[in-house]
Amino acid sequence: MNCCFLPIRWLAALLLLAGLSALPRPGHAQNPLLPGYFADPSIKKFGDKYYLYVTTDGYQPYGNLGLTFVWTSTNLSDWQPEVVEGLPYKSVWAPAVVQGRNNKYYLYCQSSVDYIGYVYVGDTPTGPFRKVNQLEGFDLEPFADPVSGKIYVVSASQEIFEMDNDPASPTYLTRISRRISVKGRFDFTEAPYLFYRKGLYYLLWAGGRCWQKSYNVRYATAKSLAGPFVDAPAPLLQNDEAHGVFGPGHNSVLEVDGRTFLLYHRQDAERAPTCGFRFTCASEVAFNPDGSLKLVRYVDDLGAALGHKSPYVNLALNKPVFANTEEATHRATQAADGRNDTRWTTGANEPGTLTIDLLREQAVKRVEVDFEYPDKLLTFKVEYSSDNLSWTTLADHSKEAIMACQARAVDRDFRARYVRLTVLNSEDRNASVWELRVLGTNPGR
């Protein structure tokens, strides 16, 4: 609408100053943090880098038939995928990691086949990991208690496992030394998460069912891990179709710069309700004077919300895009719209060519291609041109198939007006791309 008397940026600033939620416009789904189907996010910071562990989603019928990924970032804006080495292929749900006092990393997860929790150990946050023990339980999430200094693991079986906390023990953080039953009466389904603040333990979990719109994030508080935990009267996050948030659940908590964010997954709006196609998103929450939590706003860009500047600017954002073919609901322009849940897709057995016009010749530092499935093989090439006639090859994987995540980014300085992606073949026999980013230097950095 054009009836506003104030510029949009002024109005947004006034809303924020008034403490009102800055929500996506109705009908406009919340933008995921990551490009693609990733669920069960567990975020940790080791050193100066953030690690976002996720379940690889988007495979029929149960979602997780792919490799396990962790996405890393130093600024919460630019995320890079890495394969978590040493885990089973196709059957890992909800990986979560904690660093021990011995400087080793302990990964807790569960199998999508036997529905039982496991613990792995490795020397780095990305592995390679080695399986050490079967822990039982489900949706295991480690918790470093700042009060006792001990590490616990919370389970969807409504238990808190006190682990062996002796670093000299051969079963350090891999054996349960004591089980604490979670006391309280609440709609506890799965995905528990613990954190501590100002004398209160906060237990968050997913209520409802992941394949229904009833899926939501709830929480309870207690003064000790022994409980009892007192349930909050209403969900912290729930289905909000007016703002494109379908079935949010399975969260972790990020505390940074004095602010608190929930990272969770929401269902793909195209397929909702669904338990197999989910996107990782973020929302900011705040604490009331009595310690209760409230939703502040849905977040489309976590780094930008925190004022963290990327070294790059996307030169391709909302620029003219041309393709030789496209599906009716997945058009070429969606590969340059800045969203991580819209894509350009061709029909079956159709190779695809996508060209972005930057409108003038510009200096480029990096090109990123986010294919629909990062762990699938495909053949493709990337080229650039100043006149749309003479082309220079930037990356050529046309003769030997490569896994998408292994060829996601190319760092090279060049000048061009046009960038072209040609997808010759893929495991799905089509071309499907969330976003083609052409990155230049951010002048505001």
Identify the role of each PLM range.
Residues A348-E350, P374-G444:
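Trp- and acidic/polar-enriched beta-sheet ligand-binding modules for extracellular glycan
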